[in-house]
Amino acid sequence: MGQKVNPNGLRFGINKQWLSRWVPTDQLQMAKWLVEDDKIRKYLSTKYKNAGIDHVEIERDQQRVNVYVYAVQSGLLIGTEASEKKLIELAINKIVGRKQLVSLKVVEVQIPELQASLMAREIADAIENRVSFRIAQKMVIKKVLKAGARGIKTHVSGRLGGVEMAREEGYTQGVMTLHTLRADIDYSMQEAHTTYGIIGVKVWINRGELFGNKLVNSVAHAANKEFSRSSKPKKGSFNRSSRSKNTKPAPKQAVSE
């Protein structure tokens, strides 16, 4: 029986890079560096929540730590005359130790609508602000498809709408080939903290296919074209993954002898 796996973990080493890239000398150093990487990511995501951080990549060796922060609003992380950047480097230096040389590099996300973590966070924030979970998902789906994605899948679970019994619901639109390893699938899971409990939000975004270093049927190609589809999807285009509508068969034509 087929099992669902994390699309990011399935593609590490194929068309995705590991978020932490280093080689420890022993198991003790590996455990120490894992904890430090987790502290760095939690510090950045907590203090600079409004910067729209997509993900953080960390490279290190025995003397140096390079931190790459991918964010929508890079100016909040750099500051005037790189003042905020220096404060972040000092904070990271306290986490990893004074002997390590810390270098912070901020990369601006060009198309935030194609990043699964940012879109999942947008749905979670809307649910926290008491927006209907269905409306929140449909708004994000329209935005992602308009930005040039080939397909998107959303899924929410928990006490949806504050009801007593937990349930799950989701939408799928476009092409979503989870088993194709060359497909550039971005996946993220976020949580919405409400007064009636935690709502889990999952988002899958299909950005095209990768053949070596060449991106085919991707956002880069789609961005150069005008989309013929309107921003408003057709009626009935949002299909819940949990159920499908039955279509009536066409009436048979009478055959005269």
Swiss-Prot record:
GO terms for molecular function: mRNA binding; rRNA binding; structural constituent of ribosome. GO terms for cellular component: cytosolic small ribosomal subunit. Residues 223-257 are annotated as: Disordered. Residues 231-246 have a biased composition (Basic residues). SUPFAM superfamilies: Prokaryotic type KH domain (KH-domain type II) (SSF54814), Ribosomal protein S3 C-terminal domain (SSF54821). Pfam families: KH_2, Ribosomal_S3_C. Coiled coil: none annotated. Residues 40-110 form the KH type-2 domain. GO terms for biological process: translation. Belongs to the universal ribosomal protein uS3 family. Part of the 30S ribosomal subunit. Forms a tight complex with proteins S10 and S14. This is Small ribosomal subunit protein uS3. It comes from Ureaplasma parvum serovar 3 (strain ATCC 700970). The lineage of its organism: Bacteria, Bacillati, Mycoplasmatota, Mycoplasmoidales, Mycoplasmoidaceae. The gene is rpsC.
